[in-house]
């Protein structure tokens, strides 16, 4: 009751999970972003100009206490890189593991940001009916590829259904071998765990930036998360050599 009065109680969702508390939303989200349209006076015009955008289709993360956190792909961490890539001349193809609709953290949507809202409108069908990562892994890993990048956005949802996805691992190892760029941020690096194979990890020795475990440990206090994380992402990735 006290947490509810103070606005730090996680907000129940219709499916039995929890979204962030009122205070957490006030502290961690914004109605607008700092996107300025990008600065790309000479956009890329080459033949190979496609980016594969890999999104999670899973919604709820089970926390250490058994409660479920309503998550998905973070709209800002997804939209702003996409906007920059589009402005720089690239075309985007969206996939989820099975082709099911992409899960979006709608509670984090910057509702007054015209550029972000337009992007979600433009890609509404692609988000509802994305391509299948499984099909891509089976049919599109060619030597003569139009793809120059793989983008995995952030959001705690990137830790659901992607870290152990064999198809994603196959795509990442292919991209790595072809010197295709891999782009990810915040909790997105969790998906890189899928690239493990036979005790080898292609990113062993690399350095990355990701959301700190120390912050994830603190956010339950303000109701951003309904419980502590099921595992420490930074510690886990470091154990693999990152």
Give the residues covered by each predicted segment.
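Conserved, well-structured core segments that form or line functional sites
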Residues: 182-183
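Conserved active-site segments centered on acidic
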Residues: 187-189
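Extended, subdomain-level signal for the structured scaffold at the beginning of enzyme domains
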Residues: 1-178, 191-242
């Amino acid at each position: 009751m006290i947490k509810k009065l103070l606005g730090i109680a996680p907000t129940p969702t219709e499916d039995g999970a929890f979204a962030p508390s009122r205070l957490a939303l006030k502290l961690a989200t914004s109605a607008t972003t700092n996107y300025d349209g990008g600065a790309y006076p000479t956009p890329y015009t080459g033949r190979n100009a496609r980016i594969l955008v890999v999104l999670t289709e899973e919604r709820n993360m089970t926390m250490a206490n058994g409660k479920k956190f309503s998550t998905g792909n973070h709209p800002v961490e997804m939209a702003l890189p996409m906007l920059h890539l589009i402005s720089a001349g690239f075309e985007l193809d969206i996939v989820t593991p099975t082709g099911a609709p992409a899960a979006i953290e709608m509670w984090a949507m910057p509702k007054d940001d015209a550029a972000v809202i337009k992007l979600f409108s433009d890609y509404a069908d692609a988000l509802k009916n994305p391509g299948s990562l499984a099909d891509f892994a089976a049919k599109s890993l060619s030597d003569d590829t139009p793809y120059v990048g793989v983008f995995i956005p952030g959001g705690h949802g990137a830790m659901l259904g992607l870290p152990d996805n064999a198809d994603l691992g196959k795509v990442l190892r292919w991209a790595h071998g072809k010197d295709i760029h891999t782009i990810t941020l915040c909790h997105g690096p969790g998906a890189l765990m899928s690239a493990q194979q036979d005790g080898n990890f292609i990113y062993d020795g690399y350095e990355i930036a990701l959301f700190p475990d120390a912050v994830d440990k603190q956010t339950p206090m303000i109701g951003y998360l309904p419980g502590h994380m099921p595992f420490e992402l930074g510690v886990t990735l470091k154990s693999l050599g990152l």
